[in-house]
Amino acid sequence: MEPWDPPQLPPVRHSHAAGSGRAEGRHGTPPPWRPIISGPLPRPGSWDPGRDLHRPASQAESYESGHAFRAYSRQGYEDPHWQYPGAAYRDNHAYQSHQWQPTAWQGNRDVTQVKPHGKSTTYRDQHYYRGYHPNLAASPLGQDRSQTYDAYKEGSRRSWAGVSNLGEASGQPQQPSLLQQYRESGLSSSGYELSQYIRDGAEPNDTAFLGGWSPVQGGGPLESAVMAPHKFLQPHVPVCLGAGGQLVLVCPHRPTEGQLPLVELHSLEVILQGTTDQEELQAFPGPLAREDLHKVDVMTFCQQKIASSCDLSTQRGRDSALLWKLLVLLCRQNGSMVGSDVAELLMQDCRQQERYKRQEPAVGPVSLADEEWRQLGTLDLITGEVPPVVETQAQIVEKFTKLLYYGRKKDALVWAMRNQLWGHALFLSSKMDPRTYSWVLSGFTSTLATNDPLQTFFQLMSGRIPQAAQSCGDAKWGDWRPHLAVLLSNKVGDMELNHRAIVTMGDTLAGKGAVEAAHFCYLMADIPFGYFGVKADRMALLGSSHRQAFTQFATKEAIQRMEIFEYCQQLRHPTSFLLPFQVYKLLYASRLADHGLPAQALLYCEQIATVLLQQDPTSHPVLAQQLTKLAERLKLCDPLLLLEMPEQDPVLEPQWLLQLRTYCQHCQVQDDLAPEVALTQPEPWDTTATPGREMVHEQPHSDGPHDEQWHQPPVPLQGPDPHQDVSIPPLEVAVLGVGPISQEELCTEPSLQAVPTAGDAEEPQDAHGVQQPVLAELQELSTRARSASESSTASLEEDSQTSSDSPAEELEGTSEDKSFGFRWFGWFRSKPQKETSPKATTSGSPTPGLQDRRSPSPPGAVPSAQPPASPSPYRNPVSIDMKGPWDADGHEPLPGMVPLFNPAQVSQLAAARPTQPRLLSQRRYPNPL
């Protein structure tokens, strides 16, 4: 019956030979059916537990015979290949082109129509399964297949049901299965379910169905399982680069055939010999900060770069050559230079003196009478015009004098300007009003070309930034160097004006792509070097724009040029260095190591370490760590170290590397212990704290004239002894590797504050059931340090009055701290300007501004203070259930007091507020866990 056929009624029973199969029921007389077995129809020639004559059915088999099993889904493969009959069965049993229905299809049939096929030894000898199953394909005919049937049943049951073997199929002595061990040991049903997905290694029939598919994979590899292809089908050559400039190569071999690997070591310096990059690295005499280097070698290298890499036919090449010439000048003069020296260098590099076209003088509104002063000449017969008479210099001066005879100064001034008598005009106008002098001066400068350096000079002398500084770099303006030479050689009284003019010229050139020219101007203006990626910085590497990609920015030529400039500064000041440049030195050292020059790279590492060890321990921790990693790989390339290394001490290292490693470890420990420094470091108030109480975290306060102590230990519940001195020595917070920190330094870092809401974790209690009061907000105690002769009672009373007289200010300060505590702008928040009560602004109290920002002292610290007559109305809005040490005595808390909370709750608040900076909260309130 096909799955698409409609269900049919049970046919009439007729006698028919057993084993005729389903094909005869379809193409011939319907076979008789015997409703004796419920479940799936057994396959012809297969083993059936209901007809096994060798042994009785077990409990598991009885269970299987009464329940229809459903096959595993194979996602598109409906018929497992081992369910189809072999070719021999089709030939002997008239199967023709019809195939055996899968078990899942047989389950759809009526259980009353199931009839087992008769099975005999002769039928078994025919064996339709021959040629398919691996255990039956090679077996001779006529052999008893009972053991094979048992193995088939056992493997089929594991494949369909997914359970372990019960140990009865093979009939051979074996170890109990995993499922049986679980049942005997009394494990729960979860162990039974787990055993369904675990193959028992003690089952002997695991090889019965190696070619069959099963969702439960065995522990060992299957023959027909899909194997991952090899990454390399043929023997290959593994290659790696060593830190000492070595190339490690493993020759191809076959380890399975017993071939030993052959390792070859090649020098990268030899392999890369003749390449452009290596020749460029070897030509540079770096590192320059060494004793055996002479500055002549550096000057020679600069001149070689000018001749080889600078194209003087282009403006960019001339600008690059100018930078190299400036470095030569600095080396020759030991790092010192003046404006006139640079001006001479600028004019030497110019190809020729440009000729600037002069303009005709512009006459103002004052003019002369043409008919009175014009001298007419002979009429030209060709053109019909009367040409003017060309007057000599003497005649021009004579007419200027005649005008002054008649007192016509304005006319004389205009005559002098028309005839280029600028000396006479300027002197005459200087003795007149200032407006006339400015008019003559502007008329004189208007006769000069716009791009004339004289125009730049006169504009600078006039007290304004020259126009050339804002417009240079264009084709119509010509070369920018004469203008810079004028600015450098002629310093005006206002040095700020001269500096701004040079910087403006550099910015103009940089905006038009002339990076080398702009950096030349920046060097003349003493602009400091910045960092890559910071657009506000004007330069990071000399002659290279830091606004382009890093690979194009950090070139070898730019790093070498920058190192020469640093060397020139060291010639003048031996201890000077460029701190932002050290990271590029490390990059250059790594490139040297990559090109097979490890000894030279190690010298760079030593110089960088020397600079870092002179700095603050927290200046550049990342650079120090990367430098340590590279130096540890290159340390054995030092020839001096190899000569001094004894045979019994193979771990000898240079001293600078040991110091650098210690410095890196110190920085790492500081970073790891920063959130927990308050818990790990002993604090001065530990000896005065009450046992069973948590310590108060550090609290900065204002540095007033009398505020020498900003921490007060908890006071016992019975009150302080009136004869006891409660003054505390000045507090010094110990920080790892730094030493004691003053109170002024602590005040520079504001605290982070937060008030928990109702429902948060309560404070821990001691053995007496009293909760531990811990300060978690910034508060400034109004108590001051008193001498042994002063009484502590007066101080406590004053504190009580101060805290009780200003409850509104305290509550406002608390809410203000809560709103700004975990925000970044809270670090820069200015002090609120408020008017305080006279008691809060006395000489013995802290600063009023800071007192408004902080909460008062804890109520448990002043039990002897008298509360005010009326309770404060600001107690009710507080949304937290606070309990303090006063609960043990049954006393009510003092009115107007702001309750405190446990700092252990800060971690919970930070977790509930993901937008808050967790790092700051952990730093100020370490996690006690």
UniProtKB/Swiss-Prot annotation:
Keyword Glycosyltransferase in record: no
Gene Ontology annotations of biological process type: endoplasmic reticulum to Golgi vesicle-mediated transport; Golgi organization; peroxisome organization; protein localization to endoplasmic reticulum exit site; protein transport
Region (Central conserved domain (CCD)): 228-669
Polar residues bias (residue ranges): 838-848
GO cellular component, one term: endoplasmic reticulum exit site
UniProt subunit comment: SEC16A and SEC16B are each present in multiple copies in a heteromeric complex.
Family: Belongs to the SEC16 family.
Protein name: Protein transport protein Sec16B
